[in-house]
């Protein structure tokens, strides 16, 4: 009996029409936001504000790593590690 594919494996939900330029632009914007959150976290006086910026910085690190992997960055062997 065949297993049903999850939505990320079902190709009808994906267009696969992103250009390399779009991916590079997204990487550029993600790096800008990541750096902004890092700067804000370092400057934050209140703990809640610092936590907010660190959380967003950490999430964007994952985004940046994944986009670099998609673009073939030789320094990123596996974006999940």
Description of each model-found segment:
Residues 1-13, 72-81:
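Short intrinsically disordered terminal tails
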Residues 4-32:
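Short, charge/polar-rich alpha-helical segments
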Residues 33-80:
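Short, charge-rich amphipathic interface segments used for partner binding and complex assembly
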């Amino acid at each position: 009996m065949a297993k049903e594919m999850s939505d990320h494996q079902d190709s009808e939900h994906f267009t696969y029409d992103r250009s390399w330029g779009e991916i590079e632009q997204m990487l550029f914007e993600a790096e800008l936001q990541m750096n902004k959150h890092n700067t804000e976290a370092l400057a934050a006086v209140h703990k809640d504000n610092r936590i907010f910026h660190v959380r967003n910085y950490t999430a964007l690190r994952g985004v940046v790593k994944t986009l670099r992997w998609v673009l073939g960055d030789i320094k990123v062997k596996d974006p999940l590690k």
